[in-house]
Swiss-Prot record:
Cross-referenced HAMAP family: DnaA_bact
Region Domain II, annotated ranges: 74-122
Molecular function GO labels: ATP binding; ATP hydrolysis activity; DNA replication origin binding; lipid binding
SMART domains membership: AAA, Bac_DnaA_C
The organism's taxonomic lineage, starting at the top: Bacteria, Pseudomonadati, Pseudomonadota, Betaproteobacteria, Nitrosomonadales
UniProt record similarity statement: Belongs to the DnaA family.
Protein known as: Chromosomal replication initiator protein DnaA
Pfam families hit by this protein: Bac_DnaA, Bac_DnaA_C, DnaA_N
Protein role: Plays an essential role in the initiation and regulation of chromosomal replication. ATP-DnaA binds to the origin of replication (oriC) to initiate formation of the DNA replication initiation complex once per cell cycle. Binds the DnaA box (a 9 base pair repeat at the origin) and separates the double-stranded (ds)DNA. Forms a right-handed helical filament on oriC DNA; dsDNA binds to the exterior of the filament while single-stranded (ss)DNA is stabiized in the filament's interior.
Record GO cellular component, one term: plasma membrane
Domain of life, per lineage: Bacteria
């Protein structure tokens, strides 16, 4: 094995240790090492598309250079190249898609029950665009993947699976892809459908014995967006029909986008053959927004609604409303309604008055002691273990979860949280919080536990 090949294996080993599973599989794993006899001392990596290439340049080149210094005690030549599908192949895919639209559209328009809304056959909300989507650490990977899919539907990542809690922007991001594609190609056959509506379409086709028409419609789409796929759980005939539609679209290089409230393998009552297919493309999570992102969301929403909202007031609202974007926007609407009712302009004092009941409920329910007891009960350990010096894994991980939740749900400083956990240093709390954030993207069990505990504590 040449020294460059050995070095790249060295890099892969370290990246696996440094990155969570999702990050490694998305950015590093797709890179291909190219060995050139004339450039034996040059690391040449081939990126599958421009998106990955740019991301590597922006985020990993410096780290690769550092690894080279460690491995060789000197810098090496390093080059990133793009190896996209041949233009003729891409053109063939586009021509085939256009031909399928022309061939199948007349028949699809006759389909009963699934194309009745002629004014908006795609069922897309035009306000859900990438420009209107506020980006932060919690959703930047999901947004980046969505843009790549929008620019190269059926070629980039297929399917795209987006998961996360309620009200975090999954539907917005999914429909932004559809609106982007529709803007570039007004003739594209796109359908956004909530999983419950898809179930209803299956039932209707069964009642009217019209499965041929049902299949003709769903199998002829260029872009299928299925929201909240967890509602397919236990519905065997629906899963069977979706399985056939999924296969037909993927084989025809048509794009499938799916959302769920949890990781694919965590969806109970879903056939294994569907779960495995959901993993064929890119699976990305959307997490609850961090403070800065929540402030940005409020300010952007206020601007769109022509509401005068200063940063101090936005910061106050964002500081206390942490769960999801929907509740954040709900709090803003409450402040706006209170402003109109009282005849006073929106200010920090008015926001405090408008939200006092909501804040009182939150403050009453969530204390550090409550968090410790809830987490201890959940993991079946003693509350005393939360502030003990024990280092066994069965206690360390729940303790880290409790610290992370305390940072999210209380107004205590890091030193105060550390003090409540047996006089630990603030850096221990910070490490615990970062560790749990990292594990939530790579360990479905930890993510499930964290979400369940947050739900319990918020009531």
């Amino acid at each position: 094995m040449q020294k460059i090949e050995t070095f790249w294996h060295f890099c892969l080993k370290h990246f696996r240790q440094e990155l969570n599973g999702q990050q490694f599989n998305t950015w590093i794993k797709p890179l291909k090492l190219e060995v050139c006899p004339d450039e034996k001392n040059t690391l040449i990596l081939i990126a599958p598309n421009r998106f990955v290439l740019q991301w590597i340049k922006d985020n990993f080149v410096t780290r690769i250079d550092e690894m080279a210094q460690d491995h060789f005690n000197e810098r090496i030549s390093f080059r990133l190249e793009l190896r996209e599908p041949a233009e003729s192949e891409a053109q063939t895919v586009r021509t085939s898609a256009q031909k399928n639209r022309e061939d199948k559209k007349p028949a699809a328009e006759k389909t009963q029950g699934v194309t009745s809304r002629k004014t908006n056959p795609s069922q897309l909300n035009a306000s859900f665009t990438f420009d209107a989507f506020v980006t932060g650490k919690a959703n930047q990977l999901a947004r980046a993947g969505a843009i790549q899919v929008a620019e190269r539907p059926g070629i980039a990542y297929n399917p795209l699976f987006i998961y996360g809690g309620v009200g975090l922007g999954k539907t917005h991001l999914m429909q932004a892809i559809g609106n982007y594609v529709l803007e570039l190609d007004a003739g594209a056959k796109i359908r956004y459908v909530h999983a419950e509506k898809y179930v209803s379409d299956v039932v209707s086709a069964y009642q009217h014995k019209s499965f041929d028409k049902f299949k003709l419609y769903y199998h002829s789409l260029d872009l299928l967006l299925v929201d909240d796929v967890q509602f397919f759980s236990g519905k065997n005939r629906t899963q069977e029909e979706f399985f056939y539609a999924f296969n037909a679209l993927i084989e025809a290089h048509k794009q499938v986008i799916i959302t769920s409230d949890c990781y694919p393998k965590e969806i109970s009552g879903l056939e294994e053959r569907l779960v495995s297919r959901f993993g064929w493309g890119l699976t990305v999570a959307i997490e609850p927004p961090e403070l800065e992102m929540r402030v940005a969301i409020l300010l952007k929403k206020a601007l769109a609604e022509k509401i005068e909202l200063d940063e101090n007031t936005a910061f106050f609202i964002a500081k206390y409303i942490r769960s999801n974007v929907r509740e954040l926007e709900g709090a803003l609407k409450r402040v706006l309604a209170f402003s109109r009712f009282t005849g006073h302009s929106i200010s920090l004092d008015l926001a405090k008055e408008a939200l006092k009941d909501l804040l009182a409920i939150q403050n009453r329910q969530i204390s550090i002691e409550n968090i410790q007891k809830t987490v201890a009960d959940y993991y079946k350990i003693k509350v005393a273990d939360m502030y003990s010096k024990k280092r066994v894994r069965t206690i360390v991980r729940p303790r880290q979860v409790a610290m992370a939740i305390a940072k999210e749900l209380t107004q205590l400083s890091l030193p105060d949280i550390g003090e409540a956990f047996g006089g630990r240093d603030h850096t221990t709390v910070l490490h615990a919080h970062r560790k749990i954030i990292e594990l939530r993207t790579s360990d479905p069990g930890i993510n499930r536990d964290f979400n369940a505990l947050m739900h319990i504590l918020r009531g």
